[in-house]
């Protein structure tokens, strides 16, 4: 197969496995519905400076990530594809960066392609590519900043060096506008020790100032605009989203320091079996500048994230591109040496995982069925397991010829697994589909009420209105609700009957509840018994008609 055929096949695979599935499943709560609603509000309301969630101030992130998701909805429509396309584009650009950096480091087309393919099929990267979240975008900007740094350091002319440092500053600025100060910290963590090791600290001071200047020019217009609009933004964003999350005793998502070590291996599936040989080779080649640069890029951000109290799996996504390059470099070396041990081990690992998944599914179906009268979804999940097993078997039996078989396993997984979810998961985690089924009943509602932020944002996004009142819940909107002008946007349990009586005098009221506990059932019991009710799994929609005063 020549190069043109290879790239054509990869483009077809990209469309089939990454783009087609985007519209095949509802928005997951809480992240996808939140980001869809915030960006839609920007698109409809025209406020591109101050982020608002359900019409309330929401200062947990800057604005660039919302801009990109809003752009997707503006171009492709306010639909599932439009909401998710920004993540796919960001992932595709990161894959391209993996290819370009590997080509620059080793100047070998085969190694470049292997590195890009490994990165594109890492489970965490591929899985997040079809998920409307800010992490794929932020990961791209961090990747771009460090790729630009290497290009600047490896430049053969002053003009190329200036271009590299300028691009680094642009990437840091956009990363900051996407997720905050980490976009500045992570490149510094890598650049400082590497350039000190290379005795190029004068270059760091001189050209680094250019990168800082460019980053400030990118950030300052919005930073000043949001400060003028919302004077409390920077206090909340800096202390709540950075200091408390990193060092606070009450940090969200608190995990032990070693949380990311096993997760790193899981994130690399279906290539995790290559990790030992890749890390061993990196250790032997640690004195080579390209390998040292990649090792610092992998290890120092990983150490920083491990020291943070608040941890989520997606935080380590910026560490995966250098890992893919180290693994791809080691993989091609094994292929050239006809050394099949690591490849056989990886194939055996994937085969074992597939058999384990099949056994677990069979056990659950016999004891407590996950799929109940859902033959198509069960067939899809069996197809995913079968593809994973076939890929593992092929790589185990024919390691040198079928070295790329895990690509199929990963891509079939991301293409089919969302559609293979059992109904109980779909009903619980994607309420926008339930809302879409009842748009006719909801369109005329004067007031909207919900006891769950995920359900409320799904309701707001589907109806293109953010005025959903919160029923006995506050969650991450606690800050926005603290402003006096928004105090009526949340109704405590004790006041619900009085609130409903007043609201129904204005017009009909639509209430969307997620019933997951006894307290949720009590919330449902407090609603009036008249009107229409619709139920789907743990979702209940009550449409209460207008009453006369």
From Swiss-Prot:
BP GO annotations = lipid A biosynthetic process; lipopolysaccharide biosynthetic process; protein O-linked glycosylation; response to iron(III) ion
Q: Which domain of life is it from?
A: Bacteria
Q: Pfam families per the record?
A: PMT (PF02366)
Subcellular location per the Swiss-Prot or TrEMBL entry: Cell inner membrane
Q: How does it sit in the membrane?
A: Multi-pass membrane protein
User: Which terms in the GO cellular component ontology are assigned?
Assistant: plasma membrane
EC code(s) of this entry: 2.4.2.43
Where do the TM regions start and end? 9-29, 80-100, 112-132, 136-156, 176-196, 204-224, 256-276, 288-308, 312-332, 346-366, 376-396, 402-422
**Which terms in the Gene Ontology molecular function aspect does this entry carry?**
4-amino-4-deoxy-L-arabinose transferase activity; mannosyltransferase activity
Q: Which NCBIfam families match?
A: PRK13279.1 (NF009784)
Which family is it part of? Belongs to the glycosyltransferase 83 family.
Family annotation (HAMAP family): ArnT_transfer (MF_01165)
This protein is called Undecaprenyl phosphate-alpha-4-amino-4-deoxy-L-arabinose arabinosyl transferase
The taxonomy runs:
Bacteria, Pseudomonadati, Pseudomonadota, Gammaproteobacteria, Pseudomonadales
Write the gene name. Answer: arnT
């Amino acid at each position: 197969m020549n190069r043109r055929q290879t790239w054509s096949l990869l483009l077809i695979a990209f469309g089939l496995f990454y783009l087609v599935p985007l519209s095949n499943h509802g928005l997951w709560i809480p992240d996808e519905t939140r980001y869809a609603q915030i960006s839609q509000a920007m698109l409809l309301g025209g406020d591109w400076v101050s982020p608002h969630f359900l019409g309330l101030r929401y200062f947990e992130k800057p604005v660039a990530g919302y801009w990109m998701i809003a752009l997707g909805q503006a171009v492709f429509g306010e639909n599932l594809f439009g909401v998710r396309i920004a993540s796919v584009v960001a992932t595709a650009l990161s894959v391209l960066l993996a290819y370009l950096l590997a080509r620059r480091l080793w100047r070998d087309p085969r190694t470049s392609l292997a590195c890009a393919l490994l990165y594109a099929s890492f489970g965490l990267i591929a899985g997040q590519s079809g998920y409307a979240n800010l992490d794929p975008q932020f990961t791209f900007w961090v990747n771009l900043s460090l790729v630009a740094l290497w290009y600047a350091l490896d430049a053969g002319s002053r003009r190329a060096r200036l271009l590299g440092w300028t691009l680094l500053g642009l990437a840091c600025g956009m990363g900051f506008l996407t997720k905050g100060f980490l976009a500045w910290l992570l490149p510094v963590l890598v650049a400082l020790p590497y350039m000190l090791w290379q005795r190029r600290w004068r270059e760091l001071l001189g050209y680094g100032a250019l990168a800082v200047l460019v980053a400030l020019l990118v950030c300052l217009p919005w930073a000043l605009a949001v400060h003028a609009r919302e004077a409390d933004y920077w206090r909340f964003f800096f202390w709540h989203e950075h200091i408390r999350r990193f060092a606070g005793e009450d940090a969200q998502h608190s995990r032990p320091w070693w949380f990311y070590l096993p997760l790193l291996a899981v994130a690399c599936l279906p290539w995790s079996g290559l990790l030992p040989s890749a890390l061993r080779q990196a250790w032997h080649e640690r004195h080579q500048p390209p390998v040292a640069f990649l090792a610092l890029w992998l290890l120092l951000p990983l150490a920083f994230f491990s020291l943070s109290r608040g941890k989520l799996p997606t935080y380590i996504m910026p560490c995966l591109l250098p890992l893919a390059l180290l693994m791809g470099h080691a993989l091609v070396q094994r292929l050239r040496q006809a050394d099949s041990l690591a490849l056989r081990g990886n194939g055996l690992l994937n085969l074992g995982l597939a058999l384990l998944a099949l056994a677990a599914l069979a056990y659950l179906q016999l004891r407590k069925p996950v799929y109940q009268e859902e033959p198509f979804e069960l067939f899809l999940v069996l197809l995913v397991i079968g593809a994973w097993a076939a890929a593992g078997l092929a790589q185990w039996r024919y390691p040198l010829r079928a070295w790329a078989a895990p690509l199929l396993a990963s891509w079939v997984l991301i293409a089919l697994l969302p559609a293979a979810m059992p109904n109980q998961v779909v009903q619980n985690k994607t309420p926008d589909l339930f809302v879409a089924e009842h748009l006719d009943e909801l369109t005329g509602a004067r007031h909207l009420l919900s006891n769950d932020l995920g359900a409320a944002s799904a309701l707001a996004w589907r109806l293109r209105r953010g005025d959903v009142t919160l029923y006995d819940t506050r969650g991450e909107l606690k800050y926005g609700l603290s402003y006096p002008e928004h105090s009526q946007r949340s109704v405590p349990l004790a006041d619900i009957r009085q609130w409903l009586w007043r609201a129904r005098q204005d017009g009909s009221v639509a209430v969307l509840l997620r019933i997951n506990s006894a307290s949720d059932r009590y919330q449902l019991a407090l609603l009036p018994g008249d009107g229409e009710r619709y139920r789907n799994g743990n979702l209940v929609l009550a449409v209460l008609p207008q009453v006369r005063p």
